[in-house]
């Protein structure tokens, strides 16, 4: 039986605070107190607080999320980013259908309403809990971020309309055969690239996927390494692990297993893995150096890293850095190329190569209807190698 040095950590408790918090404004929430005799647009706007009084019981992030009431026709993020910043001002800007993504309104879960804290100032445990809550909601929603097939049938142009035949995954670099080879339910459209394309996985190898989600990349890797190989998926969200394990039988993937754990504390034995892959997950980790350090630990000498992730190409505006949805939606947590190289070097890796993919701005620009995120982000391939042991 395989043993590992780091036990799976218990789910952290989210710290609470009594400081003023502003709830996210949408058509289906009621974050403002309305003065009698006025309509909703003239309402006096009073911020709600995480605790009504010093003696009241603090609310958890999940409780705060449940407190936001939603109607059947609710559309998350119904207000523009500028309107939210103005604390409730309306906007008549038309909302054009956009490519489904991690920030898609289809799969967006209600998150913590603390939009006053910069990413760098957030407690790591709070960040992990926010990410866990978001992707637990996606896992249990019964659909991927782009519906059944990743297409927006509403028309009006856009990359998911009838004007393109490519699915969301094909736009990320997968070919049609890749998509067709994996059973429904595993491809949730949560990536920003295709690690299989450059991981050079070989038959008989052991592959580890950091943040494996419902298992799409794991099942593709299983086809590459064959029955003599082994694939391990690690995810910190119990709901995702359950969904991935259900997909094992659907894909007849006996050489794939999924383990609950954090990618900074991998439940994997030392020097037991040939290849580490990941797809748009490392940016979500609040302590990235720890992720690379533990990745180095589990790799065999000569083992390699093949990661697809977003990298920051320009400084984020303050409202992006303070937006919880930007943090959990693979935007605000992105690092620069130089910072990533420094962290990989610090972990001990050699042959570090990070190649931004300029063409990725086409789909990244569609991640947010109110802002062109392609001005700040680009998808990149991240490759590195653990030095071989001298015999």
Swiss-Prot record:
Its EC number is 2.1.1.137. Belongs to the methyltransferase superfamily. Arsenite methyltransferase family. This is Arsenite methyltransferase. Keywords: Arsenical resistance, Plasmid, S-adenosyl-L-methionine, Transferase. Residues 1-126 are annotated as: Disordered. GO terms for biological process: response to arsenic-containing substance. Disruption phenotype: Deletion causes increased sensitivity to arsenite. Induction: By arsenite and antimonite. It comes from the Archaea. PANTHER family: ARSENITE METHYLTRANSFERASE. It catalyses: arsenic triglutathione + [thioredoxin]-dithiol + S-adenosyl-L-methionine + 2 H2O = methylarsonous acid + [thioredoxin]-disulfide + 3 glutathione + S-adenosyl-L-homocysteine + H(+); arsenic triglutathione + 2 [thioredoxin]-dithiol + 2 S-adenosyl-L-methionine + H2O = dimethylarsinous acid + 2 [thioredoxin]-disulfide + 3 glutathione + 2 S-adenosyl-L-homocysteine + 2 H(+); arsenic triglutathione + 3 [thioredoxin]-dithiol + 3 S-adenosyl-L-methionine = trimethylarsine + 3 [thioredoxin]-disulfide + 3 glutathione + 3 S-adenosyl-L-homocysteine + 3 H(+). It comes from Halobacterium salinarum (strain ATCC 700922 / JCM 11081 / NRC-1). Catalyzes the transfer of a methyl group from AdoMet to arsenite, producing methylated arsenicals.
